[in-house]
UniProtKB/Swiss-Prot annotation, chain B:
Transmembrane residue ranges: none
MF-aspect GO terms: glucose-6-phosphate dehydrogenase activity; NADP binding
Enzyme class, first EC level, given as a word: oxidoreductase
Keywords on record: Carbohydrate metabolism, Glucose metabolism, NAD, NADP, Oxidoreductase
Annotated residues for binding of substrate: H175, K179, E213, D232, K337, K342
Induction: Transcription is maximal during early logarithmic phase when inducing substrates such as glycerol, glucose or gluconate are abundant. Transcription decreases during stationary phase.
Protein name: Glucose-6-phosphate 1-dehydrogenase
Catalytic function, reaction form: D-glucose 6-phosphate + NAD(+) = 6-phospho-D-glucono-1,5-lactone + NADH + H(+); D-glucose 6-phosphate + NADP(+) = 6-phospho-D-glucono-1,5-lactone + NADPH + H(+)
Pfam families, per database record: G6PD_C, G6PD_N
Metabolic or biological pathway, per its Swiss-Prot or TrEMBL entry: Carbohydrate degradation; pentose phosphate pathway; D-ribulose 5-phosphate from D-glucose 6-phosphate (oxidative stage): step 1/3
Length: 488, 489
């Protein structure tokens, strides 16, 4: 792949332009990029949706949503006016090819302009949109397509989508989003691992006892019940975010920090994941579904009472599982993955638990082995837990933490940027390092599908857990049976 | 506070009215009493040459103690209890007849600890007289530095003491070993697999050990001008720190297991050949300059100065350890008086990653460091590379410290003074924080060859202005190897 460069002219077409993702995430991110002069000078933004709005009505809707999202100090009328001048709305039905002809005429000449087609729509529309873009002459060499999750529902459906997209766009022009990869601390993982000689010699089975990766939310499904009930936590979170984090922890050093080299290494990890199938699902996985409980002092309803959720749904809102990477570096090291909704705390975290020292000099044992904590949210931080001498007389040990609170360490002048700003900028510049490649997505589905099949075949229903807890008790057992426990 | 067994003894403090005793030992004993770490039967005998009424001397002692102990830690009830333990005895340490009185003052049932806060030249005489008076049985002796001024004189002192006391009852003090963070070095190294795995020449590029003092000679002319910074600081404190950093894991925490490993390091120190002295060692002597914004005199201009002295007040040197673990890893040692600040610090520089994948212009930034701050503000800091914040192209890196500051983490806990810990260990009979005879002698042997080399060179110490980090040559010493001192300037 050639070195990414910033184009001078760019058209961004947002399909699903009046949807939540567009209004709450994409437009605020684009506004911020505009405000900081990071967009190409000649950028046009087209919001496309079925709603019969005129341009003025759309601009009013956009302004209301951007104001609600960005900080008051970041919103200025003059800047909004400049941004609004870039914005255009076109009502169209993305499933109708005739509308794409109209779209092409609306764009006028796109010669020499980068085209970014952002599909903030249902995945069922991905294939028709790609096909129609091609027919309308909007899928030329300068065109890129951005796909939001979910990318299918299974390996077969993901493959079908990828094949349809692949017929129109070659892989270098497809940008599959996992917004987790745009987060600051996720990117810090790369720097931590490959810019520090200190960690690399211990980053292997000989020194690491196990790895824990948790992505816990206090929120329930809210308005996404209809989608979520069909997907479940495994498809919604594990197949993408958690496996991506696992890849970043477990991957080998790439030869260069560029898209293909990095994604090659991630793919190798996914290919090395030991399958969990058949009866293994009972030993290696735990499913949960939240029941009524209390969060933040508030009573919250059970999952099956949420809007748009089937009353006798057996969809999981919690998954814990033990993954294994069967390669030279990691054989024998369990990776415990955990994710859930309506958990006690919102927390995304990676914990590397090292093995104890080979011989303890201190009577009564040396205490806990070392840990490296990488907190993704809230409060991004990195922490090493060590043993140190208890202050005062005698030689007793106690754990202490060397930590770096990234939010504190960074200059107060610098604004905390959003994952979507990073990702949008990368699409415009053609840098796909932080996006998922086709084979990564398919390999991830290839690993997840047998687990889903195992659950169906063996009638593994989700265990109830009260909202505001740490998930089903069986999740504790998963680790306790091997002499370990979840940390926080 | 962890539970510590407290044992009774009689502490006979030789040199009780000397500066060390009044500034350090009595305050430490007071603090131990305050924390109930002196057994109720423990007694302290203050011994000095000065004649006169004991009550007078004890009053002087009380005055000095009130000055030395922070006001919030002073407690009259504790003082009264401490006062009850105290007796003063006037005696000439080299007069055998004087020990009759000491013999009568000592309780036969309690072990005796004889603390020599005196010049080493009288250690032998005191030991002989203790033995003659029947006071050597079961007695522990505590020896303050300096123990000699070279290998030969050190041996003489050690042999004079060894005639009457076995090594197991000799406690040679290096007060650095009593510091909290120095002890944490042992925990840090041997209770944490994260570091021990990499504690070798495969992963470590070089090590810096700095012990900098802000003050000048402070009236210690009689001793210091004969000794110089190498004998005053390197032979003991800096080499002890080097041993703790470089030693192999002991099999347990017993005194001799630890000290065996330290001796192995000292034996592996490569002598610096005469032809390499100029490139590997820098001597300095401070000249007039500024400290805390005030003009201060040079060494040769100090009150009572020996005007043609060539004693060094600064030493920087590169030490190599010839063993499997450390071959090829230089240890840069640096110590001096009239430095910009008081600082004792160890910096472990790890090697660069084997293959660099980020932006080429940032390559020079890449290295990890473990910084162990001994004083001031004891703490540990691990410097790692993280991603810089921002939307800039590629992966911009920055150094971020993962750190532990003892004063922050343990703000409620009072960290004891080094002498408190050392005195407690003596009363408990633990030797691991004390220096063994062969340690002292190997350290002198290594220093002696340096001193002999300097004398043959007849080279004067290089001047450096007070308030600077030493002679420019000390920067060149490290720069010659493509490195720089951490954090200077």
């Amino acid at each position: 792949m050639s070195t990414p460069a910033t184009p001078t002219s760019c058209d961004i077409l947002v399909f699903g332009g009046t949807g939540d993702l567009a209004l709450h995430k994409l437009l605020p991110a684009l506004y911020r990029l505009h405000r900081e002069d990071r967009l190409p000078a000649d950028t046009r933004i087209f919001a496309l949706a079925r709603s019969a709005l005129d341009n003025a009505a759309f601009l009013a809707l956009a302004e209301r949503n951007v104001r609600a999202v960005v900080a008051r100090s970041e919103f200025a009328a003059e800047q909004w006016k400049g941004f609004a001048a870039r914005l255009d709305y076109l009502a169209m039905d993305a499933s109708q090819s005739a509308d794409f002809g109209r779209l092409a005429r609306h764009l006028k000449s796109s010669e020499g302009r980068v085209l970014v087609h952002y599909l903030a729509t249902s995945p069922s529309l991905f294939a028709p949109i790609a096909q129609n873009l091609s027919i309308a002459g909007l899928a030329g060499p300068q065109a890129r397509i951005v796909l939001e999750k979910p990318l299918g529902h299974s390996l077969d459906s993901a493959r079908a989508i990828n094949q349809s997209i692949g017929r129109v766009f070659d892989e270098s022009r497809v940008f599959r989003i996992d917004h987790y990869l745009g987060k600051e601390t996720v990117q810090n993982l790369m720097a931590l691992r490959f810019a520090n000689a200190l960690f690399e010699p211990v980053w292997r089975a000989a020194h690491i006892d196990h790895v824990q990766i948790s992505v816990n939310e206090t929120l329930g499904v809210e308005n996404r019940g209809g989608y979520y009930d069909h997907a479940g936590a495994m498809r919604d979170m594990v197949q993408n975010h958690l496996l991506q984090l696992l890849c970043l922890v477990a991957m080998e050093a790439p030869v260069r920090f560029d898209a293909e080299a990095v994604r090659n290494e991630k793919l190798k990890v996914l290919q090395a994941l030991k399958p969990i199938s058949g009866l293994d699902v009972q030993d290696k996985t735990v499913r949960g579904q939240y029941a009524a409980g209390r969060i933040g002092g508030q009573e919250v309803p059970a999952y099956y009472f949420e809007k748009n959720v089937d009353n006798d749904s057996d969809t999981e809102t919690f998954v814990a599982l033990q993954a294994e990477v069967e390669n030279w570096r990691w054989a024998g090291v369990p990776f415990y993955l955990r994710t859930g909704k309506r958990m006690a705390r919102k927390c995304s975290e990676i914990v590397i638990q090292f093995k104890p020292v080979p011989h303890s000099l201190i009577d009564g044992g040396g205490g806990p082995a070392n840990r490296l904590w990488i907190r993704l949210q809230p409060e991004e931080r990195i922490s090493v837990q060590l043993m140190a001498k208890t202050p005062g007389k005698g030689m007793q040990l106690e754990p202490v933490e060397l930590d770096l609170n990234l939010a504190e360490a960074l200059s107060r002048n610098k604004r905390r940027w959003d994952a979507y700003e990073r990702l949008l900028l990368d699409v415009i510049e053609g840098d796909s390092t932080l996006f998922m490649r086709r084979d990564e997505v398919e390999a991830a589905w290839g690993w997840v599908d047998p687990i889903l099949a195992g659950w169906r075949e063996h009638y593994q229903s989700p265990r109830p857990y009260p909202a505001g807890s740490n998930g089903p008790e069986q999740a504790q057992l998963l680790l306790e049976l091997q002499g370990r426990r979840w940390l926080e | 506070m962890p539970d510590v067994r407290v044992l009774p003894c009689t502490l006979a403090l030789f040199g009780a009215l000397g500066d060390l005793a009044l500034r350090k030992l009595f305050p430490a004993l007071y603090q131990l009493d305050r924390e109930n770490l002196l057994h109720r039967d423990t007694r302290v005998l203050a011994l000095a040459r000065d004649e006169g009424a004991p009550a007078e001397h004890l009053a002087t002692l009380e005055q000095r103690l009130r000055l030395a102990v922070p006001a919030k830690e002073w407690d009259d009830v504790v003082w009264q209890r401490f006062r009850e333990r105290l007796d003063y005895l006037s005696m000439d340490f080299l007069d055998p007849q004087a020990y009759v009185g000491l013999r009568e003052a000592v309780d036969d049932e309690l072990p005796l600890v004889a603390y020599f806060a005196t010049p080493a030249s009288v250690f032998g005489g005191i030991c002989e007289n203790l033995a003659a008076a029947g006071l050597a049985e079961r007695t522990r002796v505590v020896l303050e530095k300096p123990i000699g001024h070279d290998l030969e004189s050190s041996r003489e002192v050690n042999e004079a003491v060894a005639r009457f006391f076995p090594e197991s009852r000799i406690y040679r003090i290096d007060h650095y070993l009593g510091k909290e963070t120095v002890q944490n070095l042992i925990a840090l190294r041997f209770a944490n697999s994260l570091f021990e795995t990499q504690w070798n020449q495969n992963h470590i590029s070089h090590v810096e050990i700095t012990v900098a003092e802000k003050v000048g000679i402070e009236g210690r002319w009689g001793y210091f001008d004969q000794a110089g910074q190498l004998r005053d600081m390197v032979q003991n404190h800096l080499l002890q720190l080097l041993c703790l950093i470089a030693m192999d894991p002991p099999s347990d925490l017993s005194a001799d297991s630890i000290r065996d490993e330290k001796v192995k390091v000292l034996r592996a120190l490569e002598p610096i050949p005469a032809e390499q002295l100029a490139s590997r060692v820098v001597r300095g002597q401070y000249t007039a300059g500024f400290s805390d914004g005030k003009a201060v005199p040079g060494y040769l201009e100090e009150e009572h100065a020996n005007r043609d002295s060539d004693a060094e007040t600064f030493v920087a040197l590169r030490v190599d350890i010839r063993n499997w673990r450390w071959s090829g890893v230089p240890f840069y040692l640096r110590t001096g008086k009239r430095m910009p600040q008081k600082l004792s610090q160890i910096v472990i520089h790890f090697k660069e990653p084997p293959h660099y994948i980020f932006a080429p212009e940032q390559r020079s930034l890449i290295s990890n460091r473990l910084i162990i701050r001994l004083q001031p503000d004891e703490g540990i800091s691990l410097q790692v590379m993280t991603k810089d914040q921002g939307l800039g192209k590629g992966m911009q890196l920055r150094t971020g410290p993962l750190q532990l500051s003892f004063s922050e983490t343990y703000h409620a806990a009072r960290i004891p003074d080094a002498y408190e810990r050392l005195l407690l260990e003596v009363t408990q009979g633990n030797q691991y924080l004390f220096v063994r005879k062969d340690e002292v002698e190997f350290a002198w042997k290594w220093c002696d060859q340096l001193i002999a080399g300097w004398e043959r060179l007849s080279e004067a110490p290089k001047p450096y202005p007070a308030g600077s980090w030493g002679p420019v040559a000390s920067v060149a010493l490290v720069a010659r190897d493509g490195r720089s001192w951490y954090g200077d300037f």
